[in-house]
Amino acid sequence: MINQDSIVALATPSGAGAIAVIRISGAEAVSIGNSVFKSIKNKDLTKQKTHTLHLGHIVDNGKTLDEVLVSVFKGPNSYTGEDTIEISCHGSTYIQQQIIQLLLRKGCRMADAGEFTLRAFLNGKLDLSQAEAVADLISSDNEASHHIAMQQMRGGFSNEIAKLREELLNFASLIELELDFAEEDVEFADRTQFHELLNRIEFVLKRLIDSFAVGNVIKNGIPVAIVGEPNVGKSTLLNALLNEERAIVSDIAGTTRDTIEDELVIGGIGFRFIDTAGIRETKDVVESIGIKKTFEKIDQAQVVIYLFDGLKFKASSSEFVSEIEQIKNKYPLKPLLIVVNKKDILSEDEVLNITQKLENLNAKLLLISAKQKIGVEELKNELLSFVNTGALRNNETIVTNTRHYDSLLKALDEIQKVKFGLETNLSSDLIALDIKEALYQFGLITGQVSNDELLGNIFANFCIGK
């Protein structure tokens, strides 16, 4: 499947900038680069050592296009495992295109999306899960997602899967051997040891599967719905959290007619805050649509903030309590923060009345002033406490990829079938079938088992120059 042609693409983001990097990889990469490069020291790139830098000019039919710095990487000691050069030129879009067009005329072709990393995988520089981590690393926008992607790219997840696969494969070989000597009625695989191995594999698989609940939201941002009566300061709170004017702030009830989303990183974790239209009963058609969207957003949220105006609590306490209970009853498993706004102008008696009437609702209660930004940092810390960051702190493997999660679920199902087969004295040939399916799922994760369609789907999500 490895193409022998040389590919070229812009490795830096498209558009003008201080510099741009153009990457070429393939059997003829260095010779093609050498044909358009004139070194200031008259060096021949094809005769240079790997991992060297060379200053010179890109020349097209005697015309100098740019002064550049060329990096030479000889295979297999390169990212792709092939001969590779990278041309660092000035970031003019005109210069970029002129150099790329020149390289195409000299024998390169434009790289497909993710083709450089695909070649790295096909040449054994990365396994499939590591290759996918490259894309995650590029798209990471907070400390946690960066940490997870780096760990996976360095082989943390791959090594864990490879170890499970190797141990299971060793026993599978013994089971297959028993089938070859079926008439002898002998057991080469110690059933007690095999059962212990299956228990270990099951434990690891369950831990990895459970980690996806954390990993998936870290990768995509943890959605937090800010809900409550209209005009209680939800937009002001959102702006205080984000330190910018994002939502429409007005004194007219129901101003936030639609859901508004923005992102914030707290303690290295990405959160997506969703300001909604409130949940009061209304006859206004437009506002009713917004309220419907509020409940849709609560469905999607991992955490719910119910915000109300502390000055209105005395007159409307029964309504507030009813709405909080409605949310708790409809979403009993979602973490709920009850946040009281306008703390800065509440009397001690008002604060006492609020805390006494809400203390039995079994939800965390915070008093803040969104306008004065009082209590905002405490709110951020509470949000962070809802995220299970123990696995991150302990440097454990965390699964973020849906494809991996699916294969882990299927592998666990097969392992449990094997355990059941052992416990019920199922024949070795049937047990062997379930073992093979578990091994197949492990192989899908690392790429030891793959096909063109699978690889095409994975690498199509990469940028062209990677």
From Swiss-Prot:
CDD domains in UniProt: trmE (cd04164), TrmE_N (cd14858)
Source species, domain of life: Bacteria
Ligand binding (GTP): 231-236, 250-256, 275-278
Listed GO MF terms: GTP binding; GTPase activity; metal ion binding
EC number(s) on file: 3.6.-.-
Cofactor binding, note field: Binds 1 potassium ion per subunit.
General function of this protein: Exhibits a very high intrinsic GTPase hydrolysis rate. Involved in the addition of a carboxymethylaminomethyl (cmnm) group at the wobble position (U34) of certain tRNAs, forming tRNA-cmnm(5)s(2)U34.
Full protein name: tRNA modification GTPase MnmE
Gene: mnmE
